[in-house]
């Protein structure tokens, strides 16, 4: 479960920002998770709760913003929706795809005191 390591890194970033920006508590965390990122949203939710326990973000709401997958098809020169990395282009059936969205995992926003 790599989500635990991802959440540990996320908490480290949040704690560093708390020191740098002088906030005492995190009320909410919004995280963008791409459909092609190989990250399970519910596993992230569980792991964040476990890792944040007893810290600055212990009582924070954990909000997940889903980002749809998209790719540039080199065969038909179009940006197309992509549900999974191994899928062909839905327009031409080609496999020469460059992912342009949906592979991210990012802390989008923090609500702090």
Swiss-Prot record:
Record keyword Cell cycle present: no
Cystine pairings recorded for this chain: none
Superkingdom of this protein's organism: Bacteria
A Pfam family hit: HypA
Residues that hold Ni(2+) according to the record: 2
Annotated GO MF terms: nickel cation binding; zinc ion binding
GO biological process: protein maturation; protein modification process
Keywords on record: Metal-binding, Nickel, Zinc
Annotated positions binding Zn(2+): 73, 76, 89, 92
Homology family: Belongs to the HypA/HybF family.
Its biological purpose: Involved in the maturation of [NiFe] hydrogenases. Required for nickel insertion into the metal center of the hydrogenase.
Protein's name according to its UniProt entry: Hydrogenase maturation factor HypA
Organism: Rhodopseudomonas palustris (strain BisB5)
Taxonomy of the source species: Bacteria, Pseudomonadati, Pseudomonadota, Alphaproteobacteria, Hyphomicrobiales
């Amino acid at each position: 479960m790599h989500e635990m390591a991802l959440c540990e890194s996320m908490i480290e970033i949040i704690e560093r920002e708390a020191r740098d920006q002088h906030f005492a508590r995190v009320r909410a965390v919004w995280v963008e998770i791409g459909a092609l990122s190989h990250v399970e949203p519910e596993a992230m939710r569980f792991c964040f709760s476990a890792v944040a326990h007893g810290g600055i973000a212990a009582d924070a709401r954990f909000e997940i913003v889903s980002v749809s997958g998209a790719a540039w098809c080199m065969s038909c020169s179009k940006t197309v929706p992509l549900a999974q990395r191994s899928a062909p282009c839905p327009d031409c059936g080609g496999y020469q795809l460059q992912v342009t969205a949906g592979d991210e995992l990012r802390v989008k926003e923090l609500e702090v005191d």
